[in-house]
């Protein structure tokens, strides 16, 4: 029997099949082989003593490490302009993760009414200079929600971003009812409580949405130095025309990417983040 994992909690996986949702466990062979079922996986299951058993995980068309989801077609990367304060490094890490996994990211800035004007323009310029689509939201008031709905049609969309930015509020506005519990910002840490504690596929009218827990940090250390450059779409047209083969666009002379930076074809803040990430990858490799 084939189905799709809709959510996973405490070692149990809830698989949507022709017979409805079946609670399943995974066979031990997956753990032995270092393979773990993910929300979004297409799986073959068997019934043994009234217990569903995941017997096979079908090949994935896409996969995110964190949040751990499979077979999604695009990502809504949600950040708030304030409460919590926007973390540009974390935003860029989410975008890198999407690019590395061949997912189309759409950047949603929520809480537009709380934005500092100068900061808003800087962040918008940084993202738009890369060619990413940007949607502005005031989710509590419903502003911008129709634009999000348009993007969901015929897609399996992962909703991701840090805690407290309003992902559950956005999902409730899209769905039209209080589907997910919404949390308040933790005053002690000025970060959002992790209201969503597990990833789950939500079926919508024209598509599917994967709601995921919020994160205050994101590790992209699995991306190698030579692959990192391809996670910056604004670099692509300049890669391969540098003087030196294997140029990583940092200290090498006659670098086409750095020339584009000097000509204002690449955003300096994005390039600075690239160099910072490149150095972090190099430092990890030494140990």
Swiss-Prot record:
Cofactor note: Binds 1 zinc ion per subunit.
EC number(s) per entry: 3.6.1.-
One Gene Ontology term, aspect cellular component: cytoplasm
Subcellular location: Cytoplasm
The protein's required cofactors: Zn(2+)
Enzyme class per UniProt: hydrolase
Cited CDD domains: S1_YloQ_GTPase, YjeQ_EngC
Record-linked InterPro entries: G_CP_dom, NA-bd_OB-fold, P-loop_NTPase, Ribosome_biogen_GTPase_RsgA, RsgA_GTPase_dom, RsgA_N
Residues annotated for Zn(2+) binding in this entry: 242, 247, 249, 255
Keywords, ordered alphabetically: Cytoplasm, GTP-binding, Hydrolase, Metal-binding, Nucleotide-binding, Ribosome biogenesis, RNA-binding, rRNA-binding, Zinc
Binding site for GTP: 110-113, 161-169
Main location: cytoplasm
Domain CP-type G per the UniProt entry, residue ranges: 61-218
Pfam family, one: RsgA_N
GO biological process, any: ribosomal small subunit biogenesis
GO MF: GTP binding; GTPase activity; metal ion binding; rRNA binding
NCBIfam families hit by this protein: ribosome small subunit-dependent GTPase A
Subunit structure, interactors included: Monomer. Associates with 30S ribosomal subunit, binds 16S rRNA.
HAMAP family: GTPase_RsgA
Role according to the record: One of several proteins that assist in the late maturation steps of the functional core of the 30S ribosomal subunit. Helps release RbfA from mature subunits. May play a role in the assembly of ribosomal proteins into the subunit. Circularly permuted GTPase that catalyzes slow GTP hydrolysis, GTPase activity is stimulated by the 30S ribosomal subunit.
Entry similarity comment: Belongs to the TRAFAC class YlqF/YawG GTPase family. RsgA subfamily.
Name the UniProt record assigns to this protein: Small ribosomal subunit biogenesis GTPase RsgA
Source organism of this protein record: Clostridium kluyveri (strain ATCC 8527 / DSM 555 / NBRC 12016 / NCIMB 10680 / K1)
